[in-house]
Regions:
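N-terminal, polar/charged subdomain of small-to-medium soluble alpha/beta proteins
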Residues: 1-253
């Protein structure tokens, strides 16, 4: 069961909170106070949506997802915490993201100690969230910046250099890696990231699910056998799976 709360602060910040019934109101209030304290220092006003839900595969685990929008910055963060002891981690991550946007600092470092990989072996789990978007046509380094801004583990987009679906994701040795469907052209922005040299697997949706769950993968970028488009299948904190796919036909096909 989901519980919705809404409030506003003295500096004009409008706050909406959605929490799972297993997450106490006291925990939600502490989280609101922590992030409001950060935003109060910047005096941006704006609107904040905070969602708190239990992590089904971790005792006392909570995942906090925060979306903040103001005339100055737009921030999305997602961070797992252990019970109420990790509330400050939400505020710290928000502060870091805002400062990086305001100062133009480089992408966050990887590995990220606040965001352990959500990957574990399990029986085949269902896809409980499907996201269909008109994918943005981006240069790979811009896609990496979008991934960082919205605190994604991986980001699906149309690669401006090849015209194909592609993903960027956090991985060594440079922190960001690019995976393309089949065209393994060298990057025009050399040194920004590494490129996965292996063409993307062509799979059915069910085969992709089996691969993620059998091998404990946090996500899988694959080409769907039905239409030849790229898909991003990922493990959710709730334990089930999510799928991201594009709506429009990619250019250059």
């Amino acid at each position: 069961m989901k519980i919705h709360d809404c409030c506003s602060t003295a500096d004009g910040l409008v706050v909406g909170v959605q929490r799972h019934e297993a997450v106490s109101q006291h925990c939600a209030q502490r989280a609101v106070e922590a992030v409001s304290g950060v935003l109060g220092r910047y005096r941006f006003g704006g609107s904040l949506r905070l969602r708190l839900q239990r992590i089904m595969f971790a005792d006392d685990g909570i995942v906090a997802q925060l979306n903040y929008r103001s005339p100055r910055v737009t921030v999305r963060i997602q961070v797992p915490i252990v019970a109420e002891d990790g509330i400050e981690a939400i505020a710290d991550r928000l502060d870091c993201h805002i400062r990086r946007q305001l100062t133009g600092r480089p992408l966050r470092s990887w590995p990220d100690p606040q965001r352990p990989v959500v990957g574990f072996v399990s029986e085949c789990r269902p896809i409980t969230r499907r996201k269909r978007f008109h994918l943005m046509v981006l240069e790979p380094h811009i896609a990496a910046a979008v991934m960082d801004t919205f605190d994604f583990d991986a980001h699906l987009f149309i690669d401006a250099e090849t015209g194909q679906d592609a993903v960027v994701y956090w991985a060594g040795p440079l922190g960001v890696r690019l995976a393309r469907q089949s065209k393994m052209a060298p990057l025009s922005t050399a040194g920004m990231m590494t490129v996965n040299p292996i063409p993307t697997l062509c799979l059915s949706e069910q085969a992709a699910i089996q691969r993620v769950c059998m091998y404990g993968l946090p996500f899988l970028f694959f080409t769907d056998v039905r239409d030849g488009r790229g898909r991003l299948l990922y493990r959710r904190y709730a334990g089930d799976l999510g799928l991201v796919q594009g709506r429009a036909t990619a250019p250059g096909r």
